[in-house]
């Protein structure tokens, strides 16, 4: 995932920042507790495609 793209992408619901979880290939919104999948290098920024995250689950940024 391109770091320049990560800098401009925001959560489509709350417009908050996203954190890249490389281990699970997802973009995480901690405000809405949603994880948006990245498929074939393309972030799928649709709320219907996002999964709910578990409160307190650490994100692996490595």
Swiss-Prot record:
One of its GO terms (cellular component) is cytosol. It comes from the Bacteria. Pfam families: Trm112p. Gene3D superfamilies: 2.20.25.10. InterPro entries: Trm112-like. Disulfide bonds: none annotated. HAMAP family: UPF0434. Belongs to the UPF0434 family. PANTHER family: PROTEIN PREY, MITOCHONDRIAL (PTHR33505:SF4), ZGC:162634 (PTHR33505). This is UPF0434 protein RSc2531. It comes from Ralstonia nicotianae (strain ATCC BAA-1114 / GMI1000).
């Amino acid at each position: 995932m391109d770091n320049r793209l990560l800098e401009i992408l925001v959560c489509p619901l709350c417009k908050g920042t996203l954190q890249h979880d490389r281990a699970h290939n997802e973009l995480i919104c901690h405000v809405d507790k949603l994880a948006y999948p990245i498929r074939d290098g393309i972030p799928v920024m649709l709320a219907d495609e996002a999964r709910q995250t578990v409160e307190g689950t650490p994100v692996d940024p490595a």
